[in-house]
């Protein structure tokens, strides 16, 4: 166990403290990070030996939201935390992405990072705290890690960059940017923005990197004082002799195979070379079974090297495109008859079907997490079935990748979604990947725009997305537009940029090497903007404006305003009144605290009927207005007349007629319909009526 130590630094005007050596003695690295009143405990562990038979680094990252951190008791029967929320999964990915490239190549030991949220201050979001804590826990542990990394959130408030904006500033901010990196370079970018210009986004990323350097320097000081010596590791790599033999036999064949234009044919050709190579060495090597893993590793290295050489030295991509060339695009809308909006977006061999569904405001997603936000009106879900890549495997629920891609596409469209006041509908978009050869998340962005327009949703502008790639080889750099699957897998960067003609709405960047500098970032953003404008032009050829009318199968919504004090009258005891209206008309009714009432249904006649029933409940008598009422009670001094449902007024005996009325029953009886005028509503809300003011005055005879 370490000696108990506390380290502190000023981080954007608030104290960031790191406590080490107090808890979790068995973990390889452990710390508690506190930023204001947000507190996260991070622990990291590793397996003693490498995992056999794998060709990847088995890293797992879990961000655990504990509802006690915000003083809540979980709902449901069990009253305990269940599966991770969408926000927790996205934060786990935020932690994972910048640290994964910084482990040694060939490291096969299992590594786990667990960030547990202990306390949440809404002014200091715990995700950044967890990202910093994960870097610290790995850096002070004996696990080989080429960090540390720092992470920071940047907002744009009134034209100025704000580091780690508080809750009020986040509401005003036109950008939410999370950047992670080392002292030398940027490793990861995640952003949502309100059409922020490309130059401003670049400045924000570089501004964030300056803050990251301060955090890294702080962590380096902690490591110097309490860091453990790194463990000796066994890194997997093929032997020199077998490497040379495989390269001599397979390099030329594989080089030819990777230049096949069509994806499935290219994969078949590469598999054929692999089978030929394995068959050759099965005949020539005595202990062939011991070398299968090495042979496959060398073949993969050959593929990677040959693709990268072709791109960097010959400017030739696997499908023969130029570095900045976008694949052919075609779009179609309205192909699903009963859907409220639908579109297919195809770019090369990547194809996505997007379907838009409109619902009543009661269909919003209810959220129960660590944030103060309670519901979500606009949703985007992304599905990636096995058939989209020509595979056969069981269909499970959405994984972290699907949730991450769906959230990115959702964030890209959010700035152009009309407000509830402009368009009082819940909106759900579903992207079904039909064929995948790279950049499906950005195809989902494009498909979402098209299906929203097809549904008649008055979005503020069209949004398109593009994925950029990077190859650094032999000291040369190539930036690729609209990367396909192989370029993504074998490249050094996956940089997704979505936006309108005027600015960026979402960014997601992952770096597989030791980061990128300003020049490369600037070049990638410029190329991405050119590609985005081209894609928007292709999309406009299919549809460029929202349809003037909603689908006949979409619910119709009528909005009305009532006095908030009358909400209880509309709902009734135990919901009796509103349930009766819903049963009678078949509509949905959603009532806001402000008194806004949204009535939705397919048949407009039923909506109007529900509106009339609600009006009858909430309408107030007005002085000077005439009503046709029914006599409900008779007293010796007058009659009570129900002029509105549940609302009576007094018709005094002296106001029944111009002539003297000796007895009320001489003129009126219970149940009689009578036309009356409201003459007064006193300070206690009592209504006085008159019948005689509506009757012609009798003519007086001359004496």
UniProtKB/Swiss-Prot annotation:
Which reaction(s) are listed as its catalytic activity? RNA(n+1) + phosphate = RNA(n) + a ribonucleoside 5'-diphosphate
Signal peptide limits: none
Write out the annotated subcellular location: Cytoplasm
Q: Which domain of life is it from?
A: Bacteria
Q: Per the UniProt record, which EC number(s) apply here?
A: 2.7.7.8
Query: Protein biosynthesis as a keyword?
Result: no
Tell me where in this chain the S1 motif domain is found: 624-692
GO aspect biological process, one term = mRNA catabolic process
**A Pfam family the protein falls into:** RNase_PH_C
Q: Which InterPro entries match?
A: ExoRNase_PH_dom1, ExoRNase_PH_dom2, ExoRNase_PH_dom2_sf, KH_dom, KH_dom_type_1, KH_dom_type_1_sf, NA-bd_OB-fold, PNPase
Q: What is this protein called?
A: Polyribonucleotide nucleotidyltransferase
Q: Which organism is it from?
A: Clostridioides difficile (strain 630) (Peptoclostridium difficile)
């Amino acid at each position: 166990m370490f000696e108990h130590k506390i380290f502190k630094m000023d981080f954007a005007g608030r104290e960031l403290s790191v406590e080490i050596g107090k808890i979790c003695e068995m973990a390889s690295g452990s710390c508690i990070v506190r930023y204001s009143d947000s507190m996260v405990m991070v622990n990291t562990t590793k397996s003693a030996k490498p995992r056999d038979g794998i060709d990847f680094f088995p890293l797992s990252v879990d961000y655990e939201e504990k509802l006690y951190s915000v003083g809540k008791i979980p709902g449901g029967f069990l009253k305990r935390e269940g599966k991770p929320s969408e926000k927790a999964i996205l934060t786990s990915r935020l932690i994972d992405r910048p640290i994964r490239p910084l482990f040694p190549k060939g490291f096969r030991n299992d590594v786990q990072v667990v960030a547990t949220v202990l306390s949440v201050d809404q002014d200091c979001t715990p995700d950044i705290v967890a990202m910093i804590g994960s870097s610290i826990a790995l850096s002070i542990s004996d696990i080989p890690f080429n960090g540390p990394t720092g992470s920071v959130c940047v907002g744009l408030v009134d034209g100025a960059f704000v580091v780690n904006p508080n809750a009020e500033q986040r509401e005003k901010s036109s950008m939410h940017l999370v950047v992670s990196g080392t002292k030398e370079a940027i490793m990861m970018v995640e952003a949502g923005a309100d059409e922020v210009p490309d130059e401003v986004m670049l400045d924000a990323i570089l501004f964030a990197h300056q803050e990251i350097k301060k955090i890294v320097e702080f962590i380096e000081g902690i490591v110097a004082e309490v860091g453990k010596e790194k463990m000796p590791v066994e890194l997997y790599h093929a032997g020199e002799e077998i490497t040379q033999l495989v390269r001599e036999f397979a390099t030329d064949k594989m080089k030819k195979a990777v230049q096949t234009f069509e994806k499935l044919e290219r994969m078949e050709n590469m598999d054929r070379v692999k089978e030929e190579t394995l068959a050759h060495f099965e005949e020539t090597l005595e202990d062939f079974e011991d070398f299968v893993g090495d042979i496959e590793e060398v073949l993969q290295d050959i593929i990677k090297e040959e693709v990268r050489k072709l791109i960097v030295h010959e400017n030739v991509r696997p499908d023969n495109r130029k570095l900045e060339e976008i694949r052919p695009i075609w779009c179609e809308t309205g192909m699903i008859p009963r859907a409220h909006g639908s579109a297919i977006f195809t770019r090369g061999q990547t194809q996505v079907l997007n379907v838009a569904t409109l619902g009543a405001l009661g269909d919003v997603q209810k959220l129960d997490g660590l944030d103060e936000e309670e519901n979500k009106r606009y949703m985007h879900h992304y599905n990636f079935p096995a058939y989209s890549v020509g595979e056969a495997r069981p269909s499970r629920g959405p994984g972290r990748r699907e949730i991450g891609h769906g959230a990115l596409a959702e964030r890209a469209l959010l700035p152009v979604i009309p407000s509830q006041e402009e368009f009082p509908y819940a909106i759900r978009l579903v992207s079904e990947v039909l064929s995948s050869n790279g950049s499906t998340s950005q195809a989902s962005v494009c498909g979402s725009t098209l299906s929203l327009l097809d549904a008649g949703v008055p979005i503020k502008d069209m949004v398109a997305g593009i994925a950029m790639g990077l190859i650094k080889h032999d000291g040369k750099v190539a930036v690729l537009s609209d990367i396909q699957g192989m370029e993504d897998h074998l490249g050094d960067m996956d940089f997704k940029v979505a936006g309108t003609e005027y600015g960026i709405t979402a960014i997601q960047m992952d770096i597989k090497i030791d980061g990128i500098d300003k020049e490369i970032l600037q070049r990638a953003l410029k190329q991405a903007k050119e590609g985005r404008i081209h894609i928007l032009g292709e999309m406009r050829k299919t549809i460029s404006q929202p349809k003037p009318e909603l689908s006949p199968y979409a619910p119709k919504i009528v909005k009305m305003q009532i006095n908030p004090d009358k909400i209880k009258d509309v709902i009734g005891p135990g919901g009796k009144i509103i349930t009766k209206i819903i049963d009678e008309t078949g509509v949905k009714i959603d009532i806001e605290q402000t008194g806004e009432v949204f009535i939705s249904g397919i048949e407009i006649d039923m909506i109007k009927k529900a509106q009339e029933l609600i009006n009858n409940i909430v309408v107030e008598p007005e002085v000077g207005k005439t009503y046709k009422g029914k006599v409900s009670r008779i007293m010796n001094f007058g009659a009570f007349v129900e002029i509105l449902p549940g609302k009576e007024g007094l018709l005094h005996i002296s106001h029944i007629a111009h002539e003297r009325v000796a007895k009320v029953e001489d003129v009126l009886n219970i149940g009689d319909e009578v036309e009356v005028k409201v003459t007064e509503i006193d300070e206690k809300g009592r209504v006085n009526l008159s019948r005689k003011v509506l009757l012609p005055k009798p003519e007086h005879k001359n004496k």
